[in-house]
Amino acid sequence: MTDLSDIRREYTKGGLRRADLPQNPMQLFELWMTQARDAELSDPTAMCVATVDEHGQPYQRIVLLKRFDDTGFVFFTNLGSRKAQQIAANNKVSLHFPWHSIERQVSILGEAQPLSTAEVLKYFMTRPKDSQIAAWVSQQSSKLSARQVLEGKFFEMKAKFAKGDVPLPSFWGGYLVKPSSIEFWQGGEHRLHDRFLYTRQADEWVIDRLAP
C-alpha cells in the first residue's frame, strides 16, 4: 500500500464569517464563481456530478456547469448516458466544485429536472459545429471496439452536415438541478476550516455553521 499520510499543507488564503454571508446562497455562489474565474483556475465551471444506480452504487463524473440562477444549476448530456438513465430512475443528485488553488469547495444536494426541448435547443445552437456533430456521434457509455470507429463516424457525420445547421439530436438534453442544500467550505489555518450549510425550508434558506 502506498502511504500518503505525510502529504499535507496549511490553508492560509482566507476565512468565512457568518456576518459576511448573504441570505441567498446563490449570491455567494455567484461571487465565488466570479472569483474562481478571476483567479484563472483551470475549468472553474467543472463539477463532479454524482448519481446512484438501482443498487445504490454511486457513480461520479466531471461535467461542465453551463448556467445557474436562483432556480438552480444547469448541465447538458446525452440522454442515453449512464448518468441520464440513473437520473430517470432516481433524480436525487449531488454536485461538487473543487476549487483547490483558492482553498474552496462547494457541495450541492438536489433534484435534477429535465429541461424543455426549447431550452436545450437554445443552448445547442450556441455550441461549435464540431461539438454539435460530436453529440450525434457518441452513444455515451456504450462499449467501443476501437477509437477508429468513433472517429470514422465523426467524419461521416461531418460530411453529412457540411452544409446548413446541425439539427438537435432527440437523444441529447439537459437538466436543472434544484438545490435542497448548498455547503460552502473555505480552508482555514490549523485545519480549522470554515463550513456553512444552507438548507432550503419552504421558500427560505436556513444557515448553519458546521464543524470542520
Curated annotation (Swiss-Prot):
From the UniProt record, give the pathway where this protein acts.
Cofactor metabolism; pyridoxal 5'-phosphate salvage; pyridoxal 5'-phosphate from pyridoxamine 5'-phosphate: step 1/1; Cofactor metabolism; pyridoxal 5'-phosphate salvage; pyridoxal 5'-phosphate from pyridoxine 5'-phosphate: step 1/1
Query: Which coenzymes or cofactors are required?
Result: FMN
Q: Which residues bind substrate?
A: 8-11, 66, 123, 127, 131, 191-193
- Alphabetized UniProt keyword annotations: Flavoprotein, FMN, Oxidoreductase, Pyridoxine biosynthesis
**Which Enzyme Commission number(s) are listed?**
1.4.3.5
**HAMAP family named in the record:** PdxH
Which family does this protein fall into? Belongs to the pyridoxamine 5'-phosphate oxidase family.
- Which protein is depicted? Pyridoxine/pyridoxamine 5'-phosphate oxidase
Q: What organism is listed for this UniProt entry?
A: Shewanella sp. (strain MR-7)
